Regions:
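N-terminal catalytic cores of NTP/NDP-binding nucleotidyl/phosphoryl-transfer enzymes
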Residues: 1-55
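Short, high-confidence coil segments that cap the C-terminus of an alpha-helix
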Residues: 28-30, 64, 95
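Active-site cores that bind ATP or allylic diphosphates and position pyrophosphate for catalysis
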Residues: 70-416
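Short beta-strands and strand-loop turn motifs
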Residues: 6-7, 36-37, 68-70, 183-185
């Protein structure tokens, strides 16, 4: 069986994802499609708009054969770690190829850039650090350094979201010598960050902002649309405000209100530097006095919110996306030591499958080198971070909609 891997979030599944799936099967000649999908929290540093089981069902009913979960530590990490984690999973599940979207659509150019970045990793780190130390943003610094190593047009590829991830997938393949052949599919329709619907291939960003619109069904495959319409418990970034608030106050109390101890504690989380930690301390102290941090008022009612706090504490050197991921990791309690966990205890967590996907699982079960998990009760220690993230997500849903969400211990893989 030939297997193509797809690294996804399906947040939610839409026409562009169906195009990607069909094109991937056509280009690679694969028999089986395996989606490595983020769980209940996604790479942009937000909760997913729908829970992972609903999104798995949307994918399987649209033609994906097997969905496995990208461990949460990778799912809410930088593009480099996100891609590295996804490729680890695809390697363990014995994928022959990976097909990913890109604005470039040119695998040769993307591969050449990935090789250059791998060959000059130490130089890149040192030169980028020099620029950021002088107040230049990370993205702008990287652009300048890569342009010196290549040329303006090549460096410009790293200004587009999908190209950035594409290069990171290729870097992971190069560094680890994975026997996974890469293919790229040129992105169709609206751009990744478009907030308005402009074509039949609307961005997931635009769709999340228009989920209650009457005409949204035309941008989502029929079966996926029926699943979407039957589940309206949508979760948005600001819905995690209370969970973040509780976590920050917990760190503050554990620090006995000592600023230096608080800063030391939050700097254990990826992407939190001393300046960001200091701003978080002030915000946490303001919460104690029920004072909304100046500049952190939400647009709706002036109250503190996740989104407004992210905007408040971001800096020129540290972009908003990085701040959001840092705060989500704090909310979930995923400090730096948690990043080592999957490297030491790898696994494949199955979220769902159709008949072909089930046949493939049976085919590889005896030869796969890591636990292939369909029943989590036997692996609860190994899956602790993923289970904890799901529990927090389910508590948010229950608090917002007054409904009981069944956790990971109750819900088995989705079967289609």
């Amino acid at each position: 069986m030939k297997v193509v891997g797809l690294v996804t979030e399906y947040n939610p599944f839409h026409n562009g994802h169906l195009y990607h799936l069909n094109k991937a099967m056509e280009l690679t000649g694969a028999d089986i499609s395996v989606a490595v999908m983020s769980g209940d929290f996604v790479q942009r540093g937000e909760p997913a708009v729908l829970d992972k089981y609903t999104r798995t069902s949307m994918a399987l009913n649209s033609g994906v054969n097997l969905v496995v979960e990208l461990p949460v530590n990778y799912a809410v990490s930088s593009a480099e770690s996100f891609a590295a984690g996804a490729l680890k999973v695809l390697d363990y599940i014995k994928a022959d190829s990976i097909a990913f979207g890109s604005e470039s659509g040119n695998i040769e150019r993307l591969s050449k850039l990935a090789h250059i970045l791998c060959d000059n990793e130490d130089t890149l780190y040192k030169e980028i650090s020099k620029y950021t130390a002088n107040g230049i943003s990370y993205a702008a610094a990287r652009q300048k350094v890569v342009e010196k190593l290549t040329d303006k047009d090549t460096a410009a590829m790293l200004t587009s979201s999908n190209n950035i991830l594409a290069v990171e997938y290729l870097k992971a393949i190069i560094k680890n010598n994975y026997a996974i052949k890469p293919y790229t599919i040129k992105r169709q329709g609206d751009s990744y960050n478009d907030t308005d619907i402009r074509s039949e291939y609307a961005s997931a960003t635009a769709l999340r902002g228009n989920l209650k619109a009457d005409n949204i069904s035309k941008y989502i495959p029929v079966k996926a649309g029926l699943i979407l319409s039957s589940n309206t418990n949508y979760i948005y970034p600001d819905d995690i405000t209370e969970a973040l608030f509780t976590r920050l106050l917990g760190i503050l109390f554990a620090s006995s209100y000592d600023k230096n101890v608080f800063i030391e504690n939050v700097m254990r989380y990826p992407d939190v530097n001393k300046e960001i930690a200091g701003r978080l301390y002030k915000s946490a102290m303001d919460m104690i006095t029920r004072t909304v941090p100046q500049g952190a008022e939400s647009k709706d009612n002036g109250a503190f919110s996740f989104g407004s706090l992210c905007e408040h504490i971001k800096t020129k050197e540290v972009p908003l996306s990085r701040i959001k991921r840092a705060l989500v990791r704090i909310t979930l309690g995923l400090d730096k030591k948690h990043m080592e966990k999957y490297a030491n205890e790898p696994y494949i967590r199955v979220l769902g499958f159709d008949k072909k996907g089930q046949e493939y699982l049976s085919y590889i079960r005896k030869t796969v080198e890591v636990p292939l998990i369909t029943k989590i009760a036997d692996y609860k220690e190994m899956l602790l971070d993923d289970i904890h993230a799901a529990n927090i997500y389910n508590m948010i849903v229950a608090g917002k909609y007054g409904v009981k969400e069944f956790g990971d211990f109750v819900r088995g893989p989705v079967r289609v």
